[in-house]
Every structure is written in structure tokens, then in C-alpha cells.
């Protein structure tokens, strides 16, 4: 018979033509597309992984621009106006209080849900956390 391979939810790999350009052709880089609600990992200009994310809602948008991972925490308590989220897993801050991290409190990836951070399923956040280093470029585009 015929063998079908069905990727895990959210792990659809866009073609190179569909994926945004990385900020560098050398080394590792991360791109987050707010309009696509998707994160991309690149090595030497080649996309190696992509997954659905949840970025900031309209009232609390994710910051756009070019940044770098400046600190990583295996888990971090996060708080802001009206919320406290303890032990947020696999947190990588890239600009002030904006981070890429795991979200154990929702499973609505693919649509804006956050207070400005880039939410990933916990297992995907683990992959990005293990792969990325301090200083890895992060580009957030509309």
C-alpha cells in the first residue's frame, strides 16, 4: 500500500518562496511573521524549521524590527497589567520584556493571543531554546 506522512499540527513547512528572508545569510537567525502567525529558524540562509505561533493581540502588539536574543531562562515568571504567569518555559528575551517562549495555558496557535510575546507550544519552544544562542538575530515583521 501507499504510505502517507502527515506532519504534526502546526509543523507545515512553507516553501522557500513562501518564507520571509532571514536577517543574515551567516549562522543562525529567527524570523517571526505577525501576519502569518509563524516563526522560522534559519541556518546560513536556509530555513530549517517553522511553526505556528501566537503573537500579541491588537491592544498589546508584538514589537516589529531587528533584535537579538539577549537572555535565556529555562523558566521565568511573567507579570503585567492584569496577569501573572508563573514558570513560563523556554523563555528567550529579544527586546525589553518581549520574548519567544512556551505557552502551557492555551493551544490557539495561529492567531494573536499574547500580551506582546511570541507564544509557541512548549515542545517547539524547547526546540528553539536549545537551538538558539545568546546573540541570535531575531527579525519580527508585519
Task: Identify the meaning behind each predicted range.
Residues 6, 50-51, 102, 115:
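Short capping micro-motif at the N-terminus of alpha-helices
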Residues 23-25, 57-66, 71-142:
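Exported/periplasmic cell-wall-interacting domains
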Residues 1-20:
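Extracellular LysM carbohydrate-binding repeats and other cell-envelope/extracellular binding modules
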Residues 6, 32, 53, 69, ...:
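Hydrophobic aliphatic residue packing
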Residues 9, 44, 53, 72, ...:
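Surface loops and adjacent helix of pleckstrin homology
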Residues 2-3, 13, 25, 36-37, ...:
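Residue-identity detector for glutamine
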Residues 16-57:
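A structural motif detector for short, solvent-exposed N-terminal "entry" segments of globular domains
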Amino acid at each position: 500500500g501507499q504510505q502517507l506522512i502527515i506532519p504534526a499540527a502546526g509543523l507545515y513547512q512553507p516553501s522557500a518562496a513562501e518564507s520571509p528572508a532571514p536577517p543574515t545569510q551567516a549562522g543562525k537567525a529567527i524570523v517571526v511573521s505577525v501576519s502569518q502567525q509563524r516563526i522560522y529558524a534559519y541556518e546560513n540562509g536556509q530555513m530549517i524549521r517553522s511553526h505556528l505561533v501566537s503573537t500579541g493581540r491588537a491592544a498589546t502588539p508584538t514589537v516589529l524590527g531587528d533584535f537579538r536574543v539577549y537572555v535565556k531562562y529555562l523558566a521565568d515568571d511573567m507579570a503585567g497589567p492584569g496577569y501573572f504567569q508563573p514558570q513560563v518555559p523556554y523563555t528567550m528575551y529579544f527586546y525589553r520584556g518581549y520574548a519567544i517562549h512556551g505557552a502551557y495555558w492555551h493551544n490557539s496557535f495561529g492567531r494573536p493571543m499574547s500580551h506582546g510575546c511570541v507564544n509557541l507550544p512548549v515542545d517547539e519552544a524547547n526546540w528553539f531554546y536549545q537551538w538558539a544562542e545568546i546573540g541570535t538575530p531575531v527579525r519580527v515583521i508585519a
